Amino acid sequence: DFELDEFPDGFAEQIENLCNSEINADRQIEISFLARSEAVLDRDLIRTKVNLIPDTIEQIRVVDIVGLDKQADGGTHVASTAEVGRFEITKTESKGRGFKRVRFVLHDA
């Protein structure tokens, strides 16, 4: 979901091209851990509210999509972007004033 009044002309095609370009770049995914005290100092690293991370968590898992993005993340990840397969937008829709939704599928790599 996105906070947009309208989708710009050519939105779906442009997003598909950008996503597929990054997928085809075969960027490696690296996992590391940082002490919580270090991680919370980097606003780009933790993009959610720090208070949502339980106080008992002393090490923050960091996922680095090398050359593209690096952030705290506890989810499951592929080893490289090429494993994702081709990205295709199947539908764009309005979910109310200022809110848009993009539906997509991933085709086998």
Which ranges hold each PLM region?
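Active-/binding-site microenvironments in catalytic and ligand-binding cores
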Residues: D1-A109
